[in-house]
Amino acid sequence: MQTVHYLSRMCYTKLLMDSTRPLTVQQLSDKLTVPVVDLLLPCRFCSRFLTYLELREFDYKHLQLIWTEEDFVFACCSGCAYASAQFEIQQFYQLTVYGREIEQEEQRPIGQICIRCQYCLKSLDLIEKLDICSFNQPFHKVRNHWKGRCRHCKEIE
């Protein structure tokens, strides 16, 4: 029988006494010496515990854990990440540029511009950014941050 560890208040206190708060699931796992598969991290938005796959996706997307003033830690499940991304585009859309126009708008090279997926919030790597540029596809400025499509969401659409 596998033991599942819920992050108790005592664990948080130990974490804070040691040093800074972990920002990734893997850092939290290492800090607590609990395997990722045994972590129970609630979603900040729906309160559901993330599955093992969602915990791994969270780090793959380069998202950061959410810490409260009371030292509780939360993540964001895949469903809420999609919902949050759509809400932000609907409520805070600012501008669309195509392909390399983003470099003119930002006055820096594409590799230095932080861009997340407009659907799943994954941080785009350089290949994904260049792919969007080479096909002259859109980048959207939302809440002062750039959005585009990652390779996974591009295949689904």
UniProtKB/Swiss-Prot annotation:
Localization: Host cytoplasm; Host nucleus
One GO location term (cellular component): host cell nucleus
Chief localisation class: host cell
InterPro entries xref list: E6, E6_sf
Top-level taxon of the source organism: Viruses
A molecular function GO annotation: zinc ion binding
GO biological process, one term: symbiont-mediated perturbation of host ubiquitin-like protein modification
Family: Belongs to the papillomaviridae E6 protein family.
Protein name: Protein E6
Organism: Human papillomavirus 23
